[in-house]
């Protein structure tokens, strides 16, 4: 019985040897994300006015099960408005180490300001760098927002096109890390 079992095992191994591999050579090869993929948070603007869509209602913070979102609202200046409403988000922070990417904040947002984009490469050296502020999440009107909503409507997967930085990072020169 022992030789027959070894032959069966070797047959499985040899059969898998000539199949296409499941993994990819990341980061040289990029994967195609599914239409409903939820990545890094993005705050959007109105395409016609360029004003922020976030009105500082804090519904996203209230619905977050991980308590990862902090919103501080302020009154909007009528002469120089930041958002179209009476209020705007003076402070909008999200702790990406606490976020579980559930998408409840995106569903709760009444203006569609919070969108979970396609970016998933969020590596850094310090945990404090994972707390993203409003400036880190706002995207411009020119359409730099990942086309996640369009992919959800059409059902076609989104192809990633991020550039991978190569070479030395001058901002990290001279930094010593504990061993």
Swiss-Prot record:
Catalytically driven reaction(s): a quinone + NADH + 5 H(+)(in) = a quinol + NAD(+) + 4 H(+)(out)
Domain 4Fe-4S ferredoxin-type, first and last residues per copy: 45-74, 90-119
Regions of compositional bias (Basic and acidic residues) in chain numbering: 168-179
GO molecular function, one term: 4 iron, 4 sulfur cluster binding
Note accompanying the cofactor annotation: Binds 2 [4Fe-4S] clusters per subunit.
Biological process (GO), any one: aerobic respiration
CC cofactor: [4Fe-4S] cluster
Full protein name: NADH-quinone oxidoreductase subunit I
């Amino acid at each position: 019985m022992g030789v027959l079992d070894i032959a069966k095992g070797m047959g499985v191994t040899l059969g898998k040897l000539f199949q296409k591999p499941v993994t990819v050579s990341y980061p040289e090869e990029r994967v195609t994300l599914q239409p409903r993929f939820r990545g890094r948070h993005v705050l959007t603007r109105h395409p016609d006015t360029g004003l922020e869509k976030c009105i500082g209602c804090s519904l996203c913070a209230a619905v977050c099960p991980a308590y990862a979102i902090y919103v501080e609202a302020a009154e909007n200046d009528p002469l120089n408005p930041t958002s179209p409403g009476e209020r705007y988000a003076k402070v909008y922070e999200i702790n990406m180490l606490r976020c579980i990417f559930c998408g409840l904040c995106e569903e709760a947002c009444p203006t569609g300001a919070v969108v979970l984009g396609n970016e998933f490469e969020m590596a850094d050296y310090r945990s404090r760098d994972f707390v993203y502020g409003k400036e880190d999440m706002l995207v411009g009107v020119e359409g730099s927002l990942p086309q996640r909503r369009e992919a959800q409507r059409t059902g076609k997967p989104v192809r990633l096109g991020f550039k991978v930085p190569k070479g030395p990072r001058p901002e990290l020169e001279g930094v010593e890390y504990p061993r």
